[in-house]
Amino acid sequence: MNTWYREEGGIGYIEYDGKSKLGANAMLLRTLAASPHFEQFQSKASAAAEGILALQNADGSFRPWLKEPNYSFDAKYLLTFYSGEALVALLEYYIRTGLTRYFEEAARSAEFYLDEYVRNIADNYYPAYVPWHTIAYRHLYELTKADKFAEAVFTLNDKLLELQDRSYRIGRFFNPATPQYGLPHASSDGVYTEGLAYAFEMAQRTGDEVRAGRYLDAIMLSLKNIASLQYREKLDESSLPFYAYRGAIRTNAEKNRWARIDNAQHTIDAIQALGNFLGSKQASTFEPGL
């Protein structure tokens, strides 16, 4: 907070290298809303929520930058990540505070993206938006019980499963037939698995046992793949002490041996969510070591 948090005119945001993006500000609000010290940071959380709404258009869509970079960017691509993150942040802030304005604005944005990403999925599909919008629609279903949100979760995650590798590196989310969706990446595997955990819970909640089984199978395959990317033994060729990378998850099995925080954190979040939905007994059967 002392390094990157800024506040101007009642708007709170993260600024890094002269830029401030919707996705980072959404993560800021999520962190504050989840904090056990929320009361201490309540004014900053309120400012961060206003910062997200400052990037909301009249039709409910979002803009990706509060402070734009000095280089060209693809706003539509960035929003496949940031829009769902912003929705989740606003809803989690509402759940924490009960301030209905943020629920209403999140619902308004959700309606835009239901049309953009779900009803028109054939024209606009990109897998990066699936997990964040899944989590957002799961929250909205819990709050409203509107069937359209459950149906959206199923539409998105049924489509996502087309990306999962079932023949070569089983469990990863990469299909060579659709290279436009990106190269294999453990962070993607983790966040897709996290989204599928919420989709699994939605299927269970609505009594759709066929989908629940399909999603759980995909989750378990993904966790096995992620486990294969985890550093569990010391590397003879590395000069780093083992504790520096033990348990870390490398980015992919091919060339990228670097570990990233989000490779591990999305996986942790997926396992925690699934454990909450399944219960501790079944959760104990997850891939050991993760």
PLM feature segments, named:
Residues 1-290:
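Glycan-recognition and catalytic cores of secretory/periplasmic carbohydrate-active enzymes
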